[in-house]
Amino acid sequence: MEPQVTLNVTFKNETQSFLVSDPENTTWADVEAMVKVSFDLNTIQIKYLDEENEEISINSQGEYEEALKMANIKQGNQLQMQVHEGYHVVDEALPKNVVENQAAARTGKKPLAHYSSLVRVLGSDMKTTEEPAPEQCSSAPCDTDQPQDKPPDWFTSYLEMFREQVVKETVEKLEQRLQEKLVLQKPLLSSSPTEVSMPISEETLFLPENQFSWHIACSHCQKRIVGVRYQCSLCPSYNICEDCEAGPYTHDTNHVLLKLRRPVVISSEPFFYSKYSAPRLPAALEQVRLQKQVDKNFVKAEKQRLRAEKKQRKAEVKELKKQLKLHRKIHLWNSIHGLQSPKSPLGRPESLLQSNTLMLPLQPCAPVMPTLSAAFVDENLPDGTHLQPGTKFIKHWRMKNTGNVKWNTDTKLKFMWGNLTLASTEKKDVLVPCLKAGHVGVVSVEFIAPTLEGTYTSHWRLSHKGQQFGPRVWCSIIVDPFPSSESPDNVEGDRISSSKADDFSCEQEEAFLLAEEEIPLGEVTKQTEGTGASASQKTRRAASERELYIPSVDLLTAQDLLSFELLDINIVQELERVPHNTPVDMTPCMSPLPHDSPLIEKPGLGQIQEESEGAGFKAPPDSTVSAKRKAETPASVEETEEDLSGTQFVCETVIRSLTLDAAPDHNPPCRQRSPQRELQLYSTEGQQPLVLPGFCRKDSSLKFALPEEGPRGDEREEIVHIVEEEVVEEEEEVQDEEVQSQSSASSEDYIIILPECFDTSRPLGDSMYSSALSQPGLERGAEGEPGIESGLEPTEARERLPERESQPQEQSISDILTTSQPLDTVPLVPEVAGLPAALSRSAPCGQCESSGVDSPGVDSPATMHEVPPAPDDIRGEPRGSTGLANSRQRSCDHSRHHNGSSIAGGLVKGALSVAASAYKALFSGPPVTAQPIVSEDQTTALMAHLFEMGFCDRQLNLRLLRKHNYNILQVVTELLQVNNNDWYSHRY
């Protein structure tokens, strides 16, 4: 069943809707009857609108069915219909042709063939349904005088327009056909030139000779043009005949002549040849047509030209944008082939816009900014070269200028850090050869091998007016031990020279450089270019200077060195093997370590201390402790012979990351035993010592170097000593050899450079950071003048322990940290918690203060220095032995029972603690203090810290605080273990 269709019928702005079904149930006669009744009409003409909004008449059942199908398919069951009042139903007595003519006259369209039969059917239906209407219609004569018989105005106007159009088209068609026949029948006749001005009648207008007669005189021969005519496209008044065009004629040869065979008759205008002069009409029409054609061609050509110019302009703009984008990202380029001299003005991207020619993509772009860059090519002394003590040597680095700025006297090789002694201490930077861009030269530095055996390095980097650039280069050597056949005099002489080298300040000698001749690029076999960029290294100069772009190669920031992978002890062995002066993209984060000489003695304090600090300490003139040293015998050297452990590597990495901005230290390693019983501290004027708890043992002496907090030139100095606990000279004399063997075999020395976030204005016990591996300690009364021996018997130290402290003897430490302060400070007695059972690498409460690694043994002195960056302001203490066990200290009985595995475990924990503490200090801000809490306010503060960290079980937190003697580090560790166990049990 077909869907129903809604008929929207409109008659004189009145619309009614009819709902019809399929054509079988509702026929066209029914629809027409409904429309007549609805609008009270007698005779109607119904039209519907198709999909193109064209009116189509409906006069039969077939047309009605087609309209319904169209409405179902294309118009959504909607059919728009228009009703026009008319007379298509007439009396049957009239002839059939009369009815058809009347219908055609009223509708304006030719009736269909079946219209007569339809009229009969509809007429009979209308007579049966509406009897009065047919009678009235039949009785009324078809007279146009009556008002009801007069057609509507729109119909009358339409017929008038239609009549005019038909007449005009008919006349034009007849004229065209007549002209064609005349042309084909009669030949062309010649005419005289005098006929140009003769009037032409209508009869002679269509003659063949006049058809091709232009009634225009030839501009060359002055004859009337008959036949083909040539007209200039630029000069409308210049016309020549076909004969003159074939021969020579006087006209501009650049002008194009248009060939015209016959005039074109415009059908829209009737030809009234009697009213117009015959010669002018065709010429004027042809001229207009030609002018329009010329204008059209010109406009078309102009549009094409403009379109081509627009396309070319777009291509130019696109290319310029591409080049500007490349200039903005010039820091990603390794080098620029378009070189620019230093004195030339700075190239700007705006200069590219001044070019009118389209730049090809392969054309090299001018550099946007002068770039400073360098690449390491070769060296003369590879890493790990063995040298004898005191040997003078010159280290050469072959460097290539990969930038576009020539190196001048402002370009120098600047010292960064290291412990290798220079030949002169006057300057810490050396001149480099004035290399042009792309050339290779030799940079040289003169060194002196230290007198003590060990591994020594010195790191350097190129600098231009204070801005560093290029890769970092270094010199790494291994100093062999003294031969056993050396006399004591030679040893003593080397000891004195080493002692002098220990007192060097950070000033280096400006060595002479051996500049090489300019080497072409093709001869360079090794080349490494920097690819990174650092916007922070751009410096603004004066108006006469330019802004130089310096690509960063090795920034050596603490964030880079303290990444998460450095905290993983599993990768330590992989990082121990470091190539010799590797290229830029493989530059290690630390000094090269020896891996090709297994018989080298463990560097210990020597390498770590010298590479970490990088600048020596000058001894005060009022020092009363002499820097006397003893050279070790070959037997003691063999006892302490070890490879550099992974723990030392991690510690050294962390240490260097924290001391990058601090002044370097140049003290050579000191591995000799000191006969002194203690180290004496000389503080500045007006400073009072403060006693603080110690947390380091003998075998791992610590040296803390704090960055300067005050302004440059601050003379304040904070030195912390950890001195021995028990001193009994008689017992030490008896056990001297025993301590020697133990300390030389198990001692490892560390220097921890405290970060800037460490609070040096307060004593170490009051600081907001605490050690992650600290031990319970006691205060010792050591306030007094410097140089006075301060110590307590072990029994006194144990008596002063709190009652709740019941730690084993091997975890007990009662060292003394003596801090010099500018004001008198009341001694504090803080307690340091015991060593945690296990330290997780992911502990959330890392501590910032770096501590020493717990090793069984007797206490050893450690010194804390505050290092100003200026070499002139650096002060220190004379130290005769740094990092070795004091031969006069007492050894505990239990220390003999610990093997090397326990020491290694302690070292691993210490290294991880140092790394985690430094990482948390740099990235996590000030952590929670780990001081034991006794008061209720302090307990509340610790509970609040635990709440902030996410541990909200108050009873569990309080119980664990009491269990661990208010050591928040151990509390957090156990809470994390509990949470992990709970998660694991619920997860699995």
From Swiss-Prot:
Give residue spans, biased composition: Basic and acidic residues: 795-807
User: What's the domain remark here?
Assistant: The PB1 domain mediates interaction with SQSTM1.
How is this chain modified after translation? Phosphorylated by GSK3A; this phosphorylation inhibits NBR1 involvement in the formation of ubiquitinated protein aggregates.
Native organism taxonomy: Eukaryota, Metazoa, Chordata, Craniata, Vertebrata
Q: Where are the zinc fingers (ZZ-type)?
A: 213-265
Name of the protein described by the UniProt record: Next to BRCA1 gene 1 protein
Q: How does it assemble?
A: Homooligomer and heterooligomer. Interacts with TRIM55. Interacts with titin/TTN. Interacts with RNF29, USP8, MAP1LC3A, MAP1LC3B, MAP1LC3C, GABARAP, GABARAPL1 and GABARAPL2. Binds to ubiquitin and ubiquitinated proteins. Interacts with SQSTM1. Interacts with TAX1BP1. Interacts with IRF3; this interaction mediates autophagic degradation of IRF3. Interacts with IL12A and IL12B.
Q: Residues where Phosphothreonine occurs?
A: T587
The keyword Metal-binding is annotated on this UniProt entry: yes
SMART domains annotated for this entry?
A: PB1 (SM00666), ZnF_ZZ (SM00291)
